[in-house]
A protein has these predicted regions:
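Substrate-binding beta-hairpin/strand module that engages nucleic acids
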Residues: 87-100
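Hydrophobic, well-ordered secondary-structure elements that form the walls
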Residues: 1, 31, 72, 95, ...
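ABC transporter NBD signature
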Residues: 31, 65-67, 85
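Charged, surface-exposed helical/loop "interaction arms" that form contiguous linear patches used
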Residues: 1-35
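Loop/turn-to-beta-strand initiation segments
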Residues: 70, 88-90, 117-122
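C-terminal lobe/lid and adjacent interdomain/linker elements of RecA-like ASCE P-loop ATPase modules
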Residues: 104-147
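Long, charged, glycine-rich C-terminal linkers/tails
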Residues: 7, 36-55, 90-93
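Conserved ABC ATPase signature
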Residues: 13-24, 50-78, 97-104
Length: 147
């Protein structure tokens, strides 16, 4: 078992060294866009822990507000989608992903997602905030109500 664990650790480090720089660059670009330039650089370690450059120092993700953390996790997930599926021909699915976003952050995020060229965006929510934000921005969408 110890030998297997060592092999897994080595493979994880190898994957991170190959994939890590591109992932860091993509997450950093996305978080800069999502936060309106507030955060410019993110570092993702080989265990997918996130640290953000505040301009003065690097801060662990858990020291940031819940809304900012959620934006970081969104950027991480979408950066992985972009890097693993560069043609963007896969749908992206969100299931109550924006419950910790304030209205301004929600509107900016929905507009940003719409600008990314994903083939299809599926958004599950138990709230009307997302629909209200899309309507205010004049974005077309097709609601499907589940019972």
């Amino acid at each position: 078992i110890d030998e297997c664990m060592a092999i897994i650790r080595d493979l994880s480090e190898e994957i991170h060294s190959d994939f890590g720089p591109a992932l860091n660059a993509e997450v950093s670009k996305m978080i800069w866009e999502l936060t309106g330039g507030k955060y410019e650089r993110v570092v993702v370690d080989n265990e997918l822990n996130l640290r953000v450059d505040t301009g003065e120092r690097f801060v662990d993700c858990d020291q940031l507000s819940t809304g900012t953390r959620e934006q970081l996790y969104l950027a991480l997930r979408l950066a992985m989608v972009k890097l693993l599926f560069p043609k963007k021909d896969v749908p992206v699915i969100f299931d109550d992903s924006f419950v910790f976003y304030d209205d301004r952050r929600l509107a900016r995020t929905l507009a940003w997602i719409g600008s990314q060229g994903f083939a299809q965006v599926i958004l599950f929510t138990c709230q009307h905030r997302e629909m209200d934000a899309l309507e205010r921005m004049g974005v077309e969408y097709t609601p499907i109500y589940l019972d």
